[in-house]
From Swiss-Prot:
Protein name per Swiss-Prot or TrEMBL: Cell wall mannoprotein 1
Bias type Polar residues, positions: 399-420
Entries under Gene3D superfamilies matching the protein: 1.20.1280.140, 6.10.140.790
GO cellular component: extracellular region; fungal-type cell wall; hyphal cell wall; yeast-form cell wall
Amino acid sequence: MKFLSSLVVLGLSAQALASPYVDHQATKDQRDVNVFKQVLQDINLDVQKFDQDITQYQGGDPTVLLADSDAIIKTTEEGIQRIGPQPPLSVTEALALVGPVQGVNKLIMKAVDHLIEKKGPLVGGGYGPQVKDSLERQAHAASKLSELVSSKVPSPLAPISKQLSDQVAQALQKGIQAFSISARQATKVKREATKVQRDISAFKKVIQNISLAVNKFNVDIERYVGGDASHLLADGNVLIKATLDGVQSLQNEPPLSSMEALALVGPVQDLSNQILLAIQNLIDKKEPLVQAGFGGKVENNLRQQEEAAQKLSELVSTKVPHELADISRQLSDGIAAGIKKGIDAFAGTGPAPTTSSTPEASTAPAPSTPPQTPEDTLVPATSTPAPGPAPTAPDSSMVWPTSTTASPDVQPTITSSGTSVPAAPTGGNSSPAVPAFTGAASANQVSGAVGLAAGLLAVLAF
């Protein structure tokens, strides 16, 4: 029925906001949508009886089928009276309607298909016009209720609501058409309707595999009381693999129609709820996980899950009809928000990065030749001196001399090759011999500690 499709799109849109904040409004949702739920339940019961009686029908008087149809019409009209006074629905409030709407929607499609299969005995008995008239009255009542429900939908969702209402209304129209055309044409309509289930089977399989992985992850989280959490990381890796495998398997799937996308709402809703529950349970176990040294590992695993989920989301968005693109994005954002909540909870809980007091260059192989710009490196004179007085060498502690010497002063210089050689004597100057290197005003200003540091840097430089 048309109004059911409106509820379907509401449910899909509500699912798009399936985030950690939904639980906060759970009580309000149950109160506001209770009337809608009750109408759905009543229609579900009537359609279920209609379908059962159709299945059992073998020919002859179809009074029971016509009575079932009248009951559906009556329940629909009563639904109009009950829903009329209700305030407009928010997107979040529609979340609780997704499951019931999906159940009724599938049941209506099945009942119409079963009715078409009974066209032979119904038309053969002369009851074709009566069945057609009954279906037309159902469609009229459904149209009125659809218009009412559409008035309860937020305006941004109105175009999608109308489209989905028209598509679901085609279920009844298909039945009307089947009793107005040949059996061959009716069979063709039936065959085209079956295509929906075939096209989405790959998507359902991916969702199912991920759901199984999330469920195992959640069960192990609930059982965890402390200590080694390697099995939780393994569960996370299985979940990541299932997600990436899904990306691979869906690459070549054709785009989804609106109705095909709607058929995935129920499974996606269940998966989203599973993910949110698992993340919350994981956060509840934060203290023992961090104490056991697994905080950083959990954070890293969640980041990998987030990356895999993003890849799947990007792929699925290319398969969704344009008119559902925004809702698809909101849906993926809701799931991503759940994972991000876990990442934020464990952020910074891992061990601090290990810092080394030795520069990274010290771990590299020694260069075959010294650097070409040695002026920034403190290097003692170590090369063979040129003819002339030998330069004053540093002692074993690498502390440059600071006392006055009677020998001629020699100031070592650094050649372009980086080799330290003594300069020519400066003469009978009585000032101390001071090694020349950039950054030191004079040897008298270099303490023993600084000299030691200079020596160490010189060694490290080579």
